[in-house]
């Protein structure tokens, strides 16, 4: 369909944190309501891009009216489910909604400015999808510590691998951009190294369970390998399936150890 999101990797970024959160904490009414709001917001992305003119003037001219209807419907569902979730959640889980709300606002601002494909736009999307696991997990009665142990591995996986994939594209887009490629490579490797150190310290001090570190390792290693030795653009599809496998492994580790 014309209004379904075109970024196939984004489907996994939505599905894996939600499924893992339910696998760890169980299904709850509040968690389901948050999930409905998230999915509706996700489905609003493509029609919003058309309405904003991000898909070109022709798409806006030919599809603008129906895209506006689709967007309005998705936003109505998202708002209704969000309000119902706020009413259902306990105070702690209700406050945790601010965690995914912050990167979501940043993503919306990036879209309005036409920068959804920028590094910060894609990073905001990755963080928004991953951090939804926090309120969904807490909605079922789990602690903040457990909720972060679910969300952090996916936040690191999605953010670092998104940057790593950008390296592959930057090497060839428009004839290649060596400076941007090198900067993105350094950023990816630095984030991976710092994240490993910080999570390790937080587990030692008891702020996070050891499972958070174990579950984060596959994604950080994968991002570092891709950043250091990026594959040819022709292998992007294979890389995509590799990231699906790593996401699955991360989910299994989280469910088995948290």
Q: Which positions does each model-derived feature cover?
A:
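Core segments of transmembrane alpha-helices
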Residues: 12-18, 74-80, 125-132, 185-200, ...
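Interhelical loop and helix-boundary elements at the membrane-water interface
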Residues: 1-11, 59-68, 107-127, 174-189, ...
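Hydrophobic, aromatic-enriched interface-forming segments
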Residues: 122-172
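Transmembrane helix-loop-helix
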Residues: 33, 69-105, 190-230
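Intramembrane alpha-helical segments
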Residues: 79-84, 92, 96-136
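A mid-sequence, solvent-exposed acidic-amphipathic segment
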Residues: 161-205
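Helix-coil boundary and interhelical linker segments in multi-pass alpha-helical membrane proteins
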Residues: 19-35, 82-97, 131-151, 198-212, ...
